[in-house]
Amino acid sequence: MAQVNIEKRGNVYQYRFEIAPQGGKRKFINKSGFKTKSEAQEAGNIAYTEYINAGVPFKECKLSYSDYLDYWLDNYCKSNLKYNTICKYRTIIDKYIRPRLGLYRLSTLTSVRLNMFITEICDEYSFSRSYFKNILKVVKGTFRDACNLYGFIKYNPALTLRLPKMDIEKKDPKHLYTQEEIDKILFRFRYNDTFTCSFLTSCYTGMRTGEVFALTWDDIDLDKGVISIKHSIYDKAKDIKGRWYLGSTKTLSGERLIYISQTLLSALKNYKAKQDYLKQLYGNKYIYYYLEDGKNQYGKVIEKRIVQKTEETKNQITLNLVFTKSDGKFTGTDITKYPFEIIHKELGIEKCRFYDLRGSYATKVLNSGVEIRDVADMLGHRNIETTENYYVSSTDTSRKCATDNFDKMIQSEVINEISEYLVF
């Protein structure tokens, strides 16, 4: 290193390098007693590296990138990320990153090689841009933590890594439900209380699908007309106790309080009255659930599994789930699967999803004149850019209205007269 100077003092060598000035005076670190110049140089390089790392000794990591990826999943992901995110990252690592980069040492991977990897992936696969971004996010995250969190590498080679410019085939746009489609769906399923009420809840609140089916009656104040959104559900591999879990909302801002319209409030009151009647009708055959705590397969994170009550667990606190079948059975988001097959095939409303009600709600509310900041808050977004980029779409009606409004704004006698001159 050019910063480390080696000097011979008598029969031995010393290293010397300058450090930050103190009190306006130049300061140096030196050490003598080395028999050879090369010994002094090596020791000086190590000392200088420790100095620029604020006194933390730096040891070159001999881990393969493959082993480090496992280390990162076990030590960072399991403590900081949600189960589904960990599963998604593990899939990306095992399918795309490990086979191409895993054999190299972590410390030998350079920004050039990482850029080559990203380019190869983008050329070889036709994923959506968002999925390419997820691959990039994993690569950048692993190297960021290797450098800043664990000190395995001195510099972060992924710091400036980015996706190349590329033409991504556009997917089908999100479906914006028309009022005619909503009416058609509600009429078709007018006798399916659970689906109809869950559909209305999403339609009138813009809640995420997982948030809708995580609702309990304790979250809904029918007297004040408000819903407290605190949880979301997610599923895992099914076992004897089921596969549905109650987790936190997608983001911290996802926890929110939303007001219920009179239409939805009336529907929820009627639905609850019928559910209470069915509980009495089924008696001890009605199915109830409770929450069971346990650690996930990755270690420390406590999960809350939705478990059916038995004779042994009948004294557990009941989870008053809102959207269940007539006998109380909870099937999570699966309750929408069959209805949407009917919607696609019988009603002819193709390529629509339950989740699209969220985007339809956002678009309609914004077009009604509500400020975008308020819309973002109602949807549980951290920033308005998410609302603008992913959930707010224009409609033929809104574009026609905008054109008509602009036409009225610039109307004048001169323009009208000019138009008359253009008549053939």
Show where each model-derived region lies.
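DNA breakage-rejoining catalytic core of tyrosine-based enzymes
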Residues: 107, 153-155, 165-187, 230, ...
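C-terminal secondary-structure termini that scaffold catalytic or DNA-interacting sites
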Residues: 224, 235-237, 243-255, 262-264, ...
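Short, charged phosphate-coordinating catalytic segments
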Residues: 2-3, 144-156, 182, 200-233, ...
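C-terminal catalytic core of tyrosine-transesterase DNA break-rejoin enzymes
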Residues: 148, 200, 204, 210-211, ...
